[in-house]
Amino acid sequence: QLNFSPGW
């Protein structure tokens, strides 16, 4: 499982 959360 891969999670990507951008800081913008």
From Swiss-Prot:
It is found in: Secreted. Keywords: Amidation, Hormone, Pigment, Pyrrolidone carboxylic acid, Secreted. GO terms for cellular component: extracellular region. One of its GO terms (molecular function) is pigment binding. The modification Pyrrolidone carboxylic acid is found at residue 1. The modification Tryptophan amide is found at residue 8. InterPro entries: Adipokinetic_hormone_CS. It comes from the Eukaryota. This hormone adapts the animal to light backgrounds by stimulating concentration of the pigment of its red body-chromatophores. Belongs to the AKH/HRTH/RPCH family. This is Red pigment-concentrating hormone.
